[in-house]
Amino acid sequence: MAKSPSLKIKGLKLNNQANITEVDCALVGAGIMSTTLGVFLKEIHPDLSIQMIETLPGEAQESSNSWNNAGTGHAANCELNYTPLEADGTVNISKALEVNVEFDLSRQLWSYLTKKGAIKTPSAFINPVPHMSFVEGDAHVSFLKKRHTALSAHHCFRGMEYTEDQAQIAQWAPLVIKGRNPSEKVAATRIITGADVSYGSLTSILLNYLKSLPGFSASFQDEVTAVDREADGRWCLTIKNRQTDHKRFVKAKFVFLGAGGGALPLLQKSGIPESEGYAGFPVSGIWLRCDSQEIASQHEAKVYGMASVGSPPMSVPHLDT
């Protein structure tokens, strides 16, 4: 009698292939990272088989959710951490140029998908909104002026405006100036070609497109509990359904861990050398939401301030539309 196929995972031998799925690629997490990569892969290699595995009931429910990030189309228009002040007093814009080009590449991808019909309504996830930088105090004003001079000379940032006039800033972003001392030293830059991006909406759009393609599948409320390398070089993911406790396995040639905070433990379980030297730590902050249309209607911009010396970039105060 012929033996049934078997799979051995760390001492566990399975003789039933019914709960084993073999694919080319496994995407862990159903956020903007996994959906974008999935689209890339299917556009380049349409014949690839891809399975997406998500722990939560739906896509984009954590970091990609529109209320869990600033929704800024990061093009270095207003993010001051991309333009550090050097020891010689000059502003280094090399990182800003790199980030600007990267966002332009994202827009090119979205434009391509729109022309193809994969994205039906671009305004469902991306819309124009001015990007502003706002600073206080003589030293920061001096820095912002140098930054504007350096950036506005480059075609990527053509049209960027600069002012130290509170009245002008009040026209751009009245809530930022309201209640301030008129004699306070402030400055702002503005570029009207900035973008607001709903990464949550974009994730859903991309996932719906992927679902329409042959060879793609997605499962939800499925948690990856183990990542093991097999003798043939493929990866075996152990997956447990959070509702039924049903266990199954996915074998893939390529695995992408796009699971946000859950990616690090899975990376460590893989045992690859690159998993060494990483750690996760909690970052707290205050994210305030205003549902009053009377107040929200007075603000139409993404205004980024300057982080304190020694503080991480995510500590930058900003007021977003």
Identify what each model region corresponds to.
Residues 188-254:
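Helical element adjacent to the flavin cofactor pocket in flavoenzyme catalytic cores
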Residues 257-272:
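Flavin (primarily FAD) binding-site architecture
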